[in-house]
Every structure is written in C-alpha cells, then in structure tokens.
Amino acid sequence: MAKSKTCVRSRQSRGRRVPRGRSLKPLVVFAAEGATERVYINALITHRYGNRIAPSFAETRDHSSLTNLVSQIKSKMQRDGSGAEGAWIVCDTDANACHREQLEEWLLESERHHVAISHPCIEYWFVLHVKVTARSLDAQHVVKELDKEWLGGKSYKKGASIPPDLINATENAIKRV
C-alpha cells in the first residue's frame, strides 16, 4: 500500500480561499477612530449590505488620532489589502482638524481611498437617523440628544451594539445632512 501524499499549501493559496461555485466578497479595509465606529461599520455591513462585504480593520486604538489612522491603514493595505476594493478611514472632526493635510495626501494616493468624517462626532450622524437637529451642537450635547432618541428602548452607550432599526433609517440621515 502506498503512502498518501500530504497536501502542502503553496504561498499563493495562503489568504482568502475561494469556495467552489461562489465568488469572494469584496474586501474593504477600514481604520476607525473608536469602538463605536467599528461597531457601526459592522452593523451597516450586516443590516444594510447583507454581509456582502468582507471587512478588515486596521489595528487602531480608541480615540486614535488621524495621523495614527492614516499610518495604520497604510500598513494594513501593504500587508493584507493588495486585493481590497476600497480603504476607508472613519473618524470625527472634533480632534482631527490639525491632521487634515495628511488625510488629503492619503486620499490622493489612490481612487480606492475614501473617508467618512462625522461632525462633531458619530453620534450626530446617529441622531440624524431619527430626527432633524441643530448643526451647532457640540459632542456632549449630541450624546444627550441621542440618549433621548435611542432606538430599542435602552439608553445609548458608546461602543454598544447598534439597533437594526437605526441602520434601516440610514436614508433619513442621508436626506438630513
């Protein structure tokens, strides 16, 4: 009886495997400022896009500066993102205005590079899903406003899961911007 051959994976097959009969989900690399942004991105992918996107997150800490986000997404794209359809930086304006030039340079490097900036914070974007509100609110007031309007019967907590009803109201927020 002959010995069975052991299967060795070549370097080319490492990484994302293609299931037979199916195409790969498009890979999108994200660098997010905080836990709330990461949770929101995952909720969007699940509830709005039906898990048709494969997200990959750059290793960032909560409250990352824009400089750190640009640096981390560049590293992630070099390591894992050569086949990525897009790369997104998601952050707030409240503490990032001074690093804007770096972001603009990164955006010019590739058509695959994108940015989503919320002003003053991502919670303002959440409020727009459920009501029209003043643009002049600061981050602290926005969080109080959101707490009153939070869907799902609970109060809002940074980094907590995002209710599907909020994601389903995305078109409302887009119209109110």
PLM features: residue spans?
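C-terminal accessory helical subdomains adjacent to catalytic cores in phosphodiester-
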Residues: 2-27, 38-60, 74-88, 93-177
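Helix N-cap/beta->alpha junction signal
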Residues: 32-34
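Phosphate/oxyanion-binding active-site loops and adjacent basic polyanion-contact surfaces
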Residues: 37, 62-70
